[in-house]
Amino acid sequence: DMLFDMGFIRDLERIVKLTPPKRQTLLFSATIPAEVQQQAAKWLRNPDAIDITPEAIPIKLINQKIYFVERDVKDQMLIQYLCSTPRGRTMVFVRTRMDADRVGRNLTKVGLTAVSLHGEKAQAKRKRAITDFKSDEPPILVATDVAARGLDISSVSHVINYSVPEFPEIYIHRVGRTGRAGAKGEAITLCCSDERYHLGRIEELVDMKLPTAEWPFEDFPDLPHLEKAYHRKKTGHD
């Protein structure tokens, strides 16, 4: 389903047109929104629908907190949290590849070891970033959702949602990367005013009110000049 957001639907349609009329077609999708249903009606003949029960939502073992913040101080708050919190392997999720690179540079600028991971990164650099993240001294991994899909890393201690995902299922995929194998996990979300709608949809899916908290640290430390986010009227997934 995320291929639609990446602009690959036309490629999929061309591929289907090149397949023989007499064939068996199987369609797999993590979610079945209206767009997927429309394509299924075009590509499949009298299909049997198989709905696999999703894995249990990892709520109990994960300490989740929502912090309501102003957008223009997200980077400062992220840096303060990372510098002030005892943590192990840490993933920071952002919405776009530009955010991944920018946030990674800002973390590096203040002395934190960080690498970015997104779909536009060269394959060799992506492999290196993943290898480094799996090492005994892992950098902070700043990743987009699409780029992080398929990563199987069991010992992530902290997940930080720099941006609230637009699709509630993605939130579960993100926070589910911590708290595995019975371990405790931490997942925090920095939510600004225009992201509260997405937060509400997440709470509907998990059927609970996610706990909110006051920011636990004092005034921001002196930081070097940080790159500001570039705001687009319409954002896409990278």
Which residue ranges define each predicted feature?
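Non-catalytic terminal extensions of ATP-dependent helicases
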Residues: 224-238
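Conserved helicase RecA-like core
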Residues: 1-227
